[in-house]
Amino acid sequence: MNSNNKKVLVTGGASFIGSHLCEQLVQRGANVRVAENFSSGERGHLAHIECEAFEGDLLDPSFCDIATKGMEVVFHLAADHGGRGYIDSHPVECSTNMVLDGQVFRYAHRNGAEKIIFASSGCVYPTSRALIAPSYIH
């Protein structure tokens, strides 16, 4: 991706991975905006990165609309998390990710984003090492 002067939103941009992504995008000439609620992301991760930081909750439609407005590319990294054990024992709390994802996709599309890059989690993979049964493959 040619990042030169692209307007790029990184949701969850103050996280460990998100902040490194922001740093690389800025080095490649992108104009970076971060949408972050700082529940687990750290302000210090952004201290040395020339970016615009919007603090709010992406579950709030008005914040999601404002955060995505004018962005050409959206890297969607924001999510509730906690690892496999957390997901197994807190399924309702984790279902908010589906709402959050849908909201980011909807507003990014409405506001004219050219690309959305969605980063999921290693938690989506099964914990067993068993192979998928051939009967499940179509």
Where are these regions (language model features)?
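N-terminal Rossmann-like NAD(P)+-binding domain of SDR-like oxidoreductases, especially those catalyzing
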Residues: 1-138
